[in-house]
Amino acid sequence: MMDKELLEAALAARERAYAPYSKFLVGAAVRAESGKIYTGCNIENASYGLTVCAERNALFNAVGAGERKFTALCVVGDTEEPISPCGACRQVMAEFKVPCIILANLKGDVKEYTLEELLPYGFTL
């Protein structure tokens, strides 16, 4: 079931994105098992490899606050179809076993996936 509060938090986070190079603003919000929502936005850098995606930013904010278990993550961007996370973000979601991933665009299109649907053969140790 769509988590409207999580989507609204991701939309608000998107407004704080720092994307002077691509102009591609992305927001994400993750709900911890505690119920608390943590947000993140993409933050670009002139040295492109140092750019941090919104999804990882949100998860790292939560982990930095002591959270380790999550129920859902939502990411939103201005794309034709609901935005799709990059491979690095999918692997970080796998590290923290995020069970429900909600992808959305600004037109109101929303799709929900399980982690296994987005990353069926993620790397594990």
Q: What are these model-derived regions, one by one?
A:
Residues 1, 38-39:
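Polybasic, low-complexity association/targeting segments
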Residues 2-19, 67-125:
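C-terminal binding/interaction regions
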Residues 18, 47-51:
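Short glycine/threonine-rich catalytic loop with a Thr-x-Gly-x-Asp
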Residues 23-32:
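Short beta-strand scaffold segments in enzyme catalytic cores
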Residues 41, 50-56, 60, 81-95:
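Local cysteine-cluster metal-coordination motifs and their immediate loop/turn environment
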Residues 45-46, 118:
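A short acidic/small-residue loop/turn micro-motif
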Residues 53-74:
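Short, solvent-exposed cationic patches
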